[in-house]
Amino acid sequence: MATYISLIRFTQKGVETIREGPKRLDLARQAFRDAGAELKAFYLVTGQYDAVAISEAPNDETVAKLALRTAAMGNVRTETLRAFSEDEYRRIIASIG
């Protein structure tokens, strides 16, 4: 499965209902499992983002659907990046000669 990094910002609604955050995170984990993906790690962070999530999914389409479903709830906005492992990085570089 491919690895993805999601950079998360709380919306005003998300901040106002922050005490429900752990429950929403549990629901997100289940949604990932139901989609054949896995939410591997979640971090509350400081700086320009509020949280970071690391996930694995079978393809970009699955991650896009999960991101859109999450955004539709109105509590967070995400920016998701496809992350390449060191092995993938080395293979990509080797393939360009």
Residue ranges and their predicted role:
Residues 1-97:
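A compositional/biophysical signature of low hydrophobicity enriched in polar/charged and small residues
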